[in-house]
């Protein structure tokens, strides 16, 4: 039976704490030990913290409903290899970088990842995560061997590195000479994302952004951090795919309904969503469907974001 961890003052902060512990109030930090992060930015695993408004790790126990599911039972080494079949092709710049062991090691830092909900939900989350990240790192083309959706994880860095992706920020100032272009599976970009991610992982990624493209475990951790972390007004990708996100009336009027399409909106909605049919969105869906088929799970509804208003724009 899981130990119940309680804050000293119910919904509010413990008396001996001066600042919030997690969530958007703490730069996207996750609670230790898989604890729930309440809507107010505090850690515990009581219903008050894990229920309505919970920001992350909302199963509260660091290991899914059964208290300790092994992620390896959801995605085996052989499945990983088949999903990312051509990632080590000689033509792929990331050849030899992304490994199953690095993925499993990184995932241990996020106990709710791939372990929330029933088995189908867990499989669907892994399919969605790799669907989005495979698109971000794809080396495929329409007539590629085994099809375009067998070429995810071919890249670990953005091809166009001319932009510094530096947005003035007192909280996450850009380091001299550093660029925050896309790196890793999720193609983490912008100084504020590197800053928040670094805080959550205990790393100085503002001064060392290349760690996301040179350390294979950190690379996966950065991608999973982005996946697990809500950034207002966006929910987390994790909460969407596991059914823990409920759209507000504003979301509904903007066409944002639960499903894989909202995850695309979270990741790159400003460029891809609300524009009608888009080849990039279609590519994301193609990867997702291939992986769902491999896991023998349904796709769910609302796969695209063609008619969704991007978050923050309406």
From Swiss-Prot:
It comes from the Eukaryota. Coiled coil: none annotated. PROSITE patterns: CHIT_BIND_I_2, CHITINASE_19_1, CHITINASE_19_2. Gene3D superfamilies: 1.10.530.10, Endochitinase, domain 2, Endochitinase-like. The keyword Cell membrane does not apply. Keywords: Allergen, Chitin-binding, Disulfide bond, Plant defense, Signal. One of its GO terms (molecular function) is chitin binding. This is Inactive chitinase-like protein 1. It comes from Hevea brasiliensis (Para rubber tree). The gene is CHI-L1.
